[in-house]
């Protein structure tokens, strides 16, 4: 029996462990799956993904053309909140489920938004420049 084949576009990666897919391997190693990085242009991606069991979609749109070329795909998965980069109608027509991670990075995004609000309100960038140029005593005009 051949290995379960996961094809993903080369380049963009959501993994924080580098490009070795350490986190993905935790889930895929028990089923003896292989991850194959394919070129990101559509024609070459199709050639590499034609016999894939799964597509890990990232970095390129997964179009109807790509989906229609998949001969044995069982799932298209995204490591993101949205699924707008995948032609859902085409995948549904082929009976291929599309999955995502609806709560990925939500705490980090909320933290970042609050940090930006506070830094804007307190004029953090402007005050940082003043401190670095020795103009700390001018801070009252900023606050």
Ranges and model annotations:
Residues 84-96:
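Rossmann-fold NAD(P)-binding glycine/threonine-rich loop
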Residues 43-45, 61-66:
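Short acidic active-site motifs
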Residues 12-13, 80-83, 103-106:
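Short, acidic/turn-prone active-site loops that include or flank metal/cofactor-
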Residues 1-52:
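N-terminal glycine-/charge-rich "phosphate-binding" loop or analogous flexible N-terminal tail
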Residues 34-40, 57-59, 131-141:
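Short gly/ser/thr-rich secondary-structure transition/capping motifs
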Residues 94-96, 102-143:
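Phosphate-binding beta-alpha-beta segment of Rossmann-like dinucleotide-binding domains, i.e.
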Residues 52, 70-73:
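An anion/phosphate-binding loop that grips the pyrophosphate of nucleotide cofactors and donors
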């Amino acid at each position: 029996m051949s290995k379960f084949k996961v094809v993903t576009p080369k380049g963009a990666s959501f993994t924080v462990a580098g490009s070795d897919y350490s986190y993905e391997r935790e889930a895929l190693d028990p089923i003896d799956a292989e991850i194959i990085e394919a070129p990101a242009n559509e024609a070459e991606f199709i050639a590499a993904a034609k016999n894939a069991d799964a597509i890990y979609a990232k970095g390129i749109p997964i179009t109807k053309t790509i989906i229609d070329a998949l001969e044995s795909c069982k799932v298209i998965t995204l490591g993101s909140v949205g699924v707008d980069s995948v032609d859902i109608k085409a995948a549904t027509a082929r009976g291929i489920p599309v999955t995502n991670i609806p709560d990925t990075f939500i705490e980090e995004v909320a933290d970042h938004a609050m940090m930006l609000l506070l830094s804007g309100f307190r004029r953090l960038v402007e005050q940082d420049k003043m401190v670095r140029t020795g103009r700390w005593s001018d801070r009252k005009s900023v606050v």
